[in-house]
Every structure is written in structure tokens, then in C-alpha cells.
């Protein structure tokens, strides 16, 4: 069972502190796609604690979840309503996260970024609630 946790305030404080200290941040979930792209350095901002499905209305074909929500939890919720994501994200481990799927992207066709409706906080898109269209 997924334990939902809203760590928005704590994450925002960490980001503001990093800005104040001029410290680079590496936003990280399960780190399952760390091998993609070039290595980055900075203080790790772990978003795995910031998890849970915030809103899901199958009739509206929209799901909103926090960045650290495991991708398998999202897919299970959608499957229970006979729905699926509008893409086929790679699973590089059972702990792959919702935020990682969106912000690390997909190298081929079917990028979920094309289906993003909104992000609750434009200045911190990987940390806040991410709203995505789903397919029937």
C-alpha cells in the first residue's frame, strides 16, 4: 500500500536554502535513470518522500500525483479503471517515480511531456503535483 506524504513545504525550504547559499541541486527520485545523460553534481534533493496520488477522476481522464510517487502505483490506479498512460515509459527498476518519468523523459516517441496539462508550481515543476492526461 502506498503511503501518501506531502513534503511540499520541506522541499520548498530546501530549495530556497540552496538558492540563498548558491548551492546547485540535483533533484532525484529513485535514481533509476542516472545512467542517462551526463553526470551532474550538486546537493541531492530527494523527492521519494513526496508521494501519493492527489486527484484521479477516471471520467475526466486526468491524474495528478506527487513527483516521488512510484510509477507502478500510478499504473495500478489507472489499470483499475481500465486506463493507461499515454506513453510506455521504461521501467528501470520497481522504484521508478512519476517525476522521473516526466522530467527525465523518453528518448523515443511517446513522451509523456506531450500530455502534461499543468504543474502546480512552475518554479519547482519536479517537486509539486503533476497533472497528466491518461488514455482509455
List PLM regions with ranges.
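Glycine-rich beta-strand-to-loop/alpha-helix junction loops that act as flexible
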Residues: 27-32
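Short, well-ordered secondary-structure micro-motifs within conserved domains or adaptor modules
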Residues: 41-46
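Short glycine-biased active-site loop of nucleotidyltransferases that positions the nucleotide triphosphate
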Residues: 34-39
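Short, structured beta-strand-loop surface elements
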Residues: 98-100
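N-terminal glycine-rich flavin-associated loop
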Residues: 1-25, 48-94, 104-135
